[in-house]
Each structure stands twice: as C-alpha cells, then as structure tokens.
C-alpha cells in the first residue's frame, strides 16, 4: 500500500538551452520545453507536452550545443518563440485540468526553474507560470 500523496500530479520538466563550449552565452535561451504529466496514484505518464523553441538572440545553435543536447538546427529554425510556447503550455495545463487540482513541478536540481525559466521569462518579458493549488 502506498502512502497518500500531497499532489495529484507531478510535472517533470527538463529544459534545454543554448550553450557554447568553455564560455557563457548571454542571454542563454530555452530551446526545448518538455513536460511529463505523471499521476501520483499510478505513477503512469498520463500525457506529455513537448515543443522546440526558436532562440531569438542567438538563432544559430553552436556545434557544442547540438552535440550536448541532440537538438538540431532544423528543430528550432521554424519553431515557435518562447512566449508562444509558454502560452501553449498554460493552455495545456488548463486543458489537462491541472489548474483545478494539485501538482508539483519536478526538475533535476534548481537550474531549470531558478536559472533557465527565470532568465528566459525576464529576457522574453513574460510572466512565470501560475502556481499550484
């Protein structure tokens, strides 16, 4: 028997962003926005959200970035911009009923939220996602 869960869903996020080898890139931009919706009762993946994101400030991916992330230039060249993808993610969350239940974002460390998302929202001049119930 499993213990009752505090959250109905876990939303697993793992952003990928522009990068250079041995140097910083400013601003670093999110180029992949994936999310898994995991039911905490069954631990099954109920749905996924996945979009590539077109970088605006550094539209050409470095060879290092392509090698490190596996994302090709053609994946991002005609992709939507971050504000457009963020809006689609908010719609997806609403469509999935997430705004009417409890959920928690899950990432590997704090880099995705505290660095990638925060900086991308600042660069794109958009607000960060709504908080969980």
Predicted region positions:
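Conserved non-catalytic scaffold segment of RNase H-like nuclease domains
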Residues: 2-114, 118-120
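Short, well-ordered alpha-helix to beta-strand connector turns
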Residues: 7, 132-133
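A short alpha->loop->secondary-structure connector
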Residues: 120-132
